[in-house]
Curated annotation (Swiss-Prot):
Heterodimer with TRM732; for 2'-O-methylation of cytidine 32 in substrate tRNAs. Heterodimer with RTT10/TRM734; for 2'-O-methylation of position 34 in substrate tRNAs. Belongs to the class I-like SAM-binding methyltransferase superfamily. RNA methyltransferase RlmE family. TRM7 subfamily. Residues 129-254 are annotated as: Interacts with RTT10/TRM734. Methylates the 2'-O-ribose of nucleotides at positions 32 and 34 of the tRNA anticodon loop of substrate tRNAs. Requisite for faithful cytoplasmic translation. Requires TRM732 for methylation of the cytidine at position 32 of the anticodon loop of substrate tRNAs. Requires RTT10/TRM734 for methylation of the nucleotide at position 34 of the anticodon loop of substrate tRNAs. May modify position 32 in tRNA(Leu(UAA)), tRNA(Phe(GAA)), and tRNA(Trp(CCA)) and position 34 in tRNA(Leu(UAA)), tRNA(Phe(GAA)) and tRNA(Trp(CCA)). It is found in: Cytoplasm. This is tRNA (cytidine(32)/guanosine(34)-2'-O)-methyltransferase. HAMAP family: RNA_methyltr_E (MF_01547), RNA_methyltr_E_TRM7 (MF_03162).
Length: 310
């Protein structure tokens, strides 16, 4: 997060820096937790954050499980964050620079947990959006299915899975698929998520896979093959309409999260509210990007060697 006039245009952006979070997305998880309280469970011990970079959700998890928890027994608690991009260290968090679709990543997570299953898995990952909503929604659902495959292998029965989604035309397909694995599916929209965005979060409560299904992560296995035997692979969009039963579509409960007194994520605040820190100057970023794709371009620009096409 950089220094700019965005501090005034987006108060969640500013508040994140004031409170030491690396990104404004931290407030999305906090507001989801205010509604569902999945991080307030005293028995929550093993947590996985997928697609975690730059690490704001991992920061929330660290503070909830270690800094703010009233429990004195915190030795057994573990947080593992996974991302293809490198992440700067976070207290109480083990970071893995790894691919969530690879079996070796699964093995590394289970080893860190002592071969115990996770209580909670979350994913705030999203692809680089193109502006083509149908394409963005499709790619995002593929990312969710990849996260779900890993989650199915590491989440304990009764556990919770939270992931970012893009609400589009066929999102009820995803609701139906997740309904085969979880007792309750809720689509939640935090106040800190811009109302103009298709972004929302799927909250899956009570992991309850079929008793005769054993998930196995394999790089050579397709999504359909992975979910073979748990009925989820029955639901797919086919060009042949006769293969699709409209009655199988589910409508998930929709819930807005966050207090009505919260800031409007779509509003521009020219005068900072009194609840925001007194200074109106721009704040330094909490954590600079570790290896941004634009790093070389910045170096060339600062040295005056960046050429412009005519």
């Amino acid at each position: 997060m950089g220094k700019s006039s965005k501090d005034k245009r987006d108060l969640y952006y500013r508040k994140a820096k004031e409170q030491g979070y690396r990104a404004r997305s931290a407030f999305k998880l906090l507001q989801l937790n205010d509604q569902f309280h999945f991080l307030d469970d005293p028995n929550l011990k093993r947590v996985v954050d997928l697609c975690a970079a730059p690490g704001s959700w991992s920061q929330v998890l660290s503070r909830k499980l270690f800094d703010e928890s009233p429990s004195s027994d915190k030795e057994d608690r573990k947080i593992v964050s996974v991302d293809l991009q490198p992440m700067s260290p976070i207290p109480h968090v083990t970071t893995l620079q790894a691919d969530i679709t690879h079996p070796k990543t699964l093995a590394r997570i289970l080893k860190l947990f002592g071969n115990e299953k996770a209580d909670f898995v979350c994913s705030d990952g999203a692809p680089d959006v193109t502006g083509l909503h149908d394409l963005d929604e499709y790619v995002q659902q593929q990312l969710i299915m990849s996260a779900l495959q890993l989650t199915a292998c590491i989440l304990k029965k009764g556990g919770t899975f939270v992931a970012k989604i893009f609400r589009g035309r066929d999102i009820d397909m995803l609701y139906s698929q997740l309904g085969y694995l979880f007792d309750k599916i809720v689509c939640a929209k935090p106040r800190s998520s811009r109302g103009t965005s298709l972004e929302a979060f799927i909250v899956c409560l009570g992991y309850n896979p079929p008793s005769n299904w054993t998930p196995k992560l394999d790089v050579n296995t397709s999504v359909d093959e992975f979910f073979q035997g748990c009925f989820l692979n029955k639901l797919c969009i086919s060009d042949k309409l006769s293969h699709w039963n409209e009655e199988e579509r589910n409508i998930a409960e929709f819930m807005a999260c966050g207090s009505l007194q919260s800031f409007d994520s779509d509003a521009t605040y020219h005068d900072l509210p009194s609840s925001v820190a007194g200074t109106s100057s721009s704040l330094d970023p909490v954590q600079s990007p570790t290896n941004p794709p634009y790093k070389k371009a910045l170096e060339l620009k600062r040295s005056g060697k960046l050429t412009r096409s005519v």
